[in-house]
Amino acid sequence: MAPRHVRLLLMLGAFASGLVLCGAIILLAMGPLSSGGPQVAAIGGPFRLINQDGKTVTDQDFRGRPFLAFFGFTHCPDVCPTTLFEVSEIFRNLGPDADRARAIFFTVDPERDTPPAIKEYLSSFDPHLSGLTGSPEDIAAVAKSYRAIYRKVPLEQGGYTMDHTAIVYLMDKQGRFVAPFSLKRTSEASTAELRKHL
């Protein structure tokens, strides 16, 4: 098969994979699943992971304050740093009220994202961000509980990148899912939305 045809097939495969990922994101963004009446979707749940300081933390450590949750990885070239920058802007806008909320960065790349790697990465963002990692099994479990999907994608030049759900989750003070948190608005509007849940 000619190299040009191989490249075309690879591009089509990547496009198809992207459609699957987008479909999953759209399904989550449509809102909670319901059977027989309104209810809060079963998104989120217990976890036991390691933070950027090497300390074991659980979902209970984040109770009592609403939080934003996002899945990503430190080698992410665009979506992750952009999202974390926008989340950082929201916390800066909150001023003294920033201590009444939290944000969690769940890695989808525990192979490379050790606590020191995450700590260095998050040093560029707001200190209210907690970066969490763990064993591949632990990460798979928490991703499943949030209905987040991710997969390793080999790169032609060697190494790999990660495809992953790019939703920001708004969770309430009890760790229950509220809604996907849109960043496609001004940081002031996003701040006002988070402030409603403090």
Report residues per predicted region.
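Short, hydrophobic alpha-helical segments
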Residues: 197-198
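Hydrophobic beta-strand anchors of alpha/beta hydrolase catalytic cores
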Residues: 68-69, 103, 168
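Structural microenvironment flanking redox-active thiols in thiol-disulfide oxidoreductases
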Residues: 82-142
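Short, small/polar residue-rich loop motifs at catalytic or cofactor-binding pockets
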Residues: 42-44, 66, 163-165
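Thiol/disulfide oxidoreductase modules built on the thioredoxin-like
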Residues: 138-193
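Short active-site neighborhood of thiol/selenol oxidoreductases, capturing the structured segment around
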Residues: 60-87
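A short beta-strand-turn-helix
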Residues: 47-67, 91-94
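N-terminal targeting signals for export/organelle localization
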Residues: 1-46, 50
